[in-house]
Amino acid sequence: MQVRIFVAVALSSALLAACGGSSNSSRAVPVNPATNNNGSPATGVITARFDPTNGVLPFPTNLLLSGTRDLTLNIPVVDPNNFGDPKVALNALDGFSTVSPMTTSFSVAPKVSTLIAGQTVRVFEVTLTGTGGGVTGIVRELQATADFVVAPTSSDSSGRTLAIVPTKPLKQLTSYMVVLTSGITDAAGNDVTPDQTYFLTKRTTALCVGGVSQEPLLPNATACALEPLRQLTGSQEAAAGAAGIAKDKIVVSWVATTQAITPVLQALQNRTAQSAPPATVIAPTGLTLGSLGVGLPPVADIYIGSLEVPYYLGVPTQANPTAALTGFWRAAPGAYVPPFAGALDPTSTFVTFANPFPVVTTAQKVPMVLTIPNASSGRTKPAAGWPIVIYQHGITRDRSDAFAIATTMAAQGYAVVAIDIPLHGITNPANPLFVGNTPLAGLGVRERTFNMDLVNNSTGAAGPDGIIDTSGNAFINLSSLLTSRDNIRQAETDLSTLTRAIPTMRYSGPADFDGSRIGFV
């Protein structure tokens, strides 16, 4: 991926063209023809592209953290409030993906056989001076095949883009350094060389001292703008040198730090565990599994109920009927946890590892279905209560799918409980379990679809058709990537809330469910 970024590297094309050789070499002294590593004369030029001024960078790279005030990415964008723009959405993240490929490009297609993981393409787990800072040391080297593979990307028909693909997820909140060497060649055997900007940052002495350029061909402003980048490159090449990579063989290097995966959900789970059990309601339906008309034996009674969950997403209103399609988790402004409190942007509301608690928008009463083994199952309730399985339906399905496993669970003496994930639910008003057909509606319980009617169910076109949109229709939302992410996060926190509620849920007595025996399917 190429991302346009301004890192104050305002190099003119004419100036760069003049910097083709060492800045310490006399331009009047003839030089020998360029040769490759194997001694053969160079017959062409292949460069590892690195031109920040024109947005040509490896991706991901910590250069995109430059100027961050809240530890999130800081990609230049036209409108920072347009979260439909994927780059704006990326700016809400506190790092990069743990599973997506890393990419970088060349001026011409490299010879595929010279792209060798662990040899010409090296990847290291490293430590940094701080967010987006220089490399201070190597923790370990990632291993070819076991940790990553390399190949030209299928999306670039020219063959000029290299993908570095993790074969298992990288660690969260961890920095990785990539180093490419001149062992990579083009089809004619010419060694890859550094791009002009990277070549300048390989310099071992300062480009700028006291505001004055130390490179005769660079104006003061340009040299001083390049100096921070030179220091980053220097720290990377020093670390690579400690791993046995010769400095003069390095053609490009960069560092990327992965995002937080568990801190936000763990923080919410801890808060849920320390809070009072959420409110629940359970009521009999008078139905058994045998009443469903699908051939199931009548071995479990069907109950309905509700669970009150803290909701962190948008809720449709008459004034804003599409709120569920655009809202995403927001933290309280500047509500950072130690040690970040007081040190970062006090206005930021992005949910990150530093500010992990989203603000509750509403308390939603969501519908539940439960199945309880009855006398026909041959099971009796243990003194500690029924062991219970939480059933999680798939995307575009609903809570009633739990009935498919209820027979088997009842035979083993297990109750089953299920709730819908966000924007899912029963959408057929003729279904007896549709919330509107039950007493739950009078208690403020709603289907989690909010009964939205925003698309034509037959054609998929935007606009209502008088029919409730299908379950999960808006769950995967490519027009608002942060909403899609947080729909999944909300589903996970809802399960934590349900787990917290189970020991106190009641349908007949003081100990109906055994909180020490909760399973998940």
Task: State where each predicted segment sits.
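Bacterial N-terminal signal peptides that target proteins for export
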Residues: 1-7
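C-terminal motif of bacterial Sec signal peptides marking the signal peptidase cleavage site
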Residues: 15-18
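Acidic, low-complexity Ser/Thr/Gly/Pro-rich repeat segments typical of extracellular/periplasmic
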Residues: 21-322
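Structural recognition of the beta-strand scaffold that forms the well-ordered cores
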Residues: 102-105, 255, 388-391, 415-419, ...
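Cap/lid segment of the alpha/beta-hydrolase catalytic domain
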Residues: 325, 331-364, 381-501
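Alpha/beta-hydrolase fold nucleophile elbow
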Residues: 511-521
